[in-house]
Amino acid sequence: MNILISNANDKPIYEQIYTQIRNQILSGALPPGQALPSIRALAKDLRVSVITTKRAYEELEKAGYLYTVPAKGSYVAEKNTQLV
């Protein structure tokens, strides 16, 4: 998964993460059932706060793009044509 963060961007960092993951899901780059990096691993890779990545994942889950399995991780949800 490739995510680029820009401090020059007007959007908050969590929103940049949200948008890029959502676009990868919609394009099929992240297929349904695909495991996403853990919140901590993604935060470390992007050099951002765990709270920032947690918020992005929560927003993606609220929007129906992800689902979380406790103690297992976050996964891409099945495509819902009503979301697109």
List where the protein language model places each region.
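Residue-identity detector for threonine
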Residues: T19, T52-T53, T68, T81
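HTH-adjacent hinge/linker in prokaryotic transcriptional regulators
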Residues: A63-V84
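N-terminal helix-turn-helix
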Residues: L36-Y67
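Generic secondary-structure boundary/loop-capping signal
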Residues: N2, S27, G33, R47-V48, ...
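Short, mixed-charge, low-aromatic patches
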Residues: N9-Q16, S49-E59, K72-G73
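Extreme N-terminal segment that seeds HTH/winged-HTH DNA-binding domains in transcriptional regulators
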Residues: M1-A35, A41
